[in-house]
Design a protein with these regions (language model features):
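Hydrophobic, aromatic-enriched, well-ordered structural segments
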Residues: 1-40, 44-47, 131-140, 147-327
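Two-metal-ion RNase H-like nuclease active-site motif
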Residues: 25, 39-42, 52-63
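Short conserved beta-strand segments at catalytic cores or DNA/RNA-binding microdomains
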Residues: 48, 66, 70-82, 90-91
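Beta-sheet entry/capping signal
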Residues: 54-55, 82, 115-117, 138-141
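Active-site beta-loop-alpha junctions of metal-dependent nucleic acid enzymes
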Residues: 65-67, 88-111
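Short Cys/His-based metal-binding microdomains
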Residues: 81-85, 145
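Short, well-ordered alpha-helical microsegments
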Residues: 99, 125-128
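Acidic/histidine-rich, metal-coordinating catalytic segments
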Residues: 115-125, 145
Length: 327
């Protein structure tokens, strides 16, 4: 930080805490007592987490300044299936020790309430830290991160054919026994059947398959979140407010404006939902009639699609056991 910024930051957070009783912040210092990382969450973020904490996404892809420091954010879906922010931090680096501090601080802020599922990048330090701090929580690897990492690690081999094969493994392979066959097909079609050990990134990706392939992910509650759509949309939103040449003081000012804009958009959606009648294509279904008035249009549309899909299946009784088959 430039001279004087540390003092300004601490003053900023002290004023926030005085004006907002529920405002929570913590500062990590290094060996010489300099500020290293900063976490904060206001009362509304804490309330939103208490409401929408089942599935969250952790993102560090947005870089806040010319020193390439990451803005870390916990995000989730609100009742309109739009991004909602639960807490943020400016991190000095992306080591396991820094992630440990951030996750412990976040949970302390949220009364140690853990989510059911957390989506993250496949960085080794992050995987280690999440496994350590979020014990008992399913951690999925975001497919968007996988695609970005594939481009960095595989170069020209990460072409359209490869991404078609990877997308199939992520979303369409629903049986663990089928995974190896489809993986071998990808290696044959895209890598000329070369051993997986020739590609370090593929070794790591295969090792962590239970965190990203539908064959395993289907057993966990994900609220329909398989990619980093939350992170992508929030990063695009951030770029409209934050620039790399902003000073730390200007950053916090613009960040607060951005958060308020997100909340204004949510209030607008709440107003429209209260004034709009949600369309139900199954008026004779007791199930659909019972939920149509309880959900926002966006959430009901998600349920509606799942209900549509249910008609693709039937059951047959076979030797006393029930099993499902698709038409």
């Amino acid at each position: 930080m430039v001279r004087g910024e540390a003092t300004v930051i601490q003053e900023f957070f002290r004023n926030e805490a005085l004006s907002k009783p529920s405002f929570y912040y913590d500062i990590q210092v290094d060996a010489v007592e300099d500020i290293a990382s900063i976490f904060w969450a206001d009362g509304i973020m804490q309330l939103d987490y208490s409401l929408f904490d089942n599935v969250i996404s952790f993102d560090t892809t947005y870089r806040t300044n010319n020193q390439y420091r990451p803005l870390a954010a916990f995000l989730g879906f609100d009742n309109h299936r739009k991004s909602v922010l639960f807490g943020a931090a400016l991190l000095y680096d992306e080591t396991a020790a820094t992630f440990d501090w951030f996750f412990i601080t976040f949970l302390k802020c949220m009364s140690n309430k853990k989510p059911q599922t957390i989506y993250i990048d496949q960085a080794t330090a992050l995987l280690m830290s999440v496994s350590n701090i979020f014990q008992g929580v399913f951690h999925g690897i975001c497919s968007w991160y996988m695609s970005e990492n594939a481009k960095k690690n595989l170069g020209s081999r990460a072409n359209n054919a490869f991404f078609d094969e990877l997308t199939n493994l992520i979303s369409n392979v629903d049986d663990e026994s089928d995974f190896d066959y489809n993986w071998d097909q990808m290696m044959k079609n895209c890598f000329n059947g070369r051993p997986i050990s020739d590609f370090t990134w593929l070794v790591q990706t295969h090792r962590n398959r239970m965190h990203w392939s539908s064959a395993w992910v289907k057993s966990h509650f994900t609220a329909g979140l398989k990619t980093t759509s939350l992170s992508e949309s929030s990063n695009a939103f951030l770029r409209g407010f934050l620039q790399p040449d902003h000073s730390i003081v200007l950053f916090f000012s613009h960040f607060n404006i951005m958060v308020q804009r997100m909340r204004d958009n949510h209030a607008d959606l709440d107003f429209k939902a209260a004034k709009t009648r949600t369309k139900n294509n199954y008026p004779n279904s007791q199930l659909m009639r019972s939920v149509v008035k309880k959900y926002t249009s966006a959430s009901f549309a998600f349920i509606h699609r799942q209900y549509d899909l249910s008609f693709k299946y039937y059951y047959e009784e076979c030797r006393g056991d029930f099993w499902m088959s698709s038409y």
